[in-house]
Amino acid sequence: VLLNCSRFFNQPEVPDVLEIPAKLGGYPVVGLGAYALCTYDFADGRDFSIIVPEGVRFVTSDAFLCCHDATRISFPSTLDDLPEGSFYHVSAEIDFPNGNPRYSCENGFLIDRDTQTLLYAAPSSQGQPIPAVRRLGDSALDNWKPAGNEIRLPDTLESIGSYALDG
C-alpha cells in the first residue's frame, strides 16, 4: 500500500506526470492509503497528472484529499474499491484508459456501476445533466454547476450523501 507521495511533490520541479510505481521494494502496490496524494503543503500550484498502475485494487477514502494540483487521474482496470468522498478538494479529470468493469466515467461523471452511485463530477461535467443514478455520493458534485440556476435530480435517485450538493 502506497502511503505517502510527498517526496515527489517536495522537489524543485514537480513532474508533469506522476506515475505511481507498480512495485515498491519488490512488493506490488495494491492500494493507495490515506493522504498518499495530498498536495496541500506541496506542489505550489504546479499542475500534474497521476497514473495509478494496473494491479492497484483499492483506494482509501482520503488518498486524494486536497490533491488540488492534479489535472488528470488515470485509474487501472483492476480498481474495485473506490469509496465515496475520495475526491474532496480535487478538480481533476478522471479516466480509465484500459476500461474498468465496476466504474465508468462519462461526460465527467464517475459512477460506481455496482451501486449506481455518482462518486465524482469532474470540471468537464459542468452544465451536463446529472446522470440516472440511485445515489449521489458524499461530496459528489463539488465541481459540478448546472446549466442555468435549476438543479434537476434524476427520477432514479433514492439517496443523497453528505455534502453531495455543496458544489
Residue ranges and their predicted role:
Residues V1-N10, G108-F109:
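Short beta-strand/loop segment at the start of cytosolic alpha/beta domains
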Residues N4, L37, L65-C66:
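The N-terminal extracellular segments of secreted preproproteins, especially immediately downstream
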Residues S6-N10, C38, Q116-T117:
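Active-site/binding-pocket entry motifs
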Residues E13-V30, F42-F58, C66-D81, V90-G108, ...:
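Structural signature of tandem-repeat unit edges
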Residues L24, A36-L37:
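Hydrophobic pocket-lining residues within nucleotide cofactor-binding pockets
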Residues L32-A34:
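Extracellular beta-strand-rich solenoid/capping regions of secreted or surface-exposed proteins
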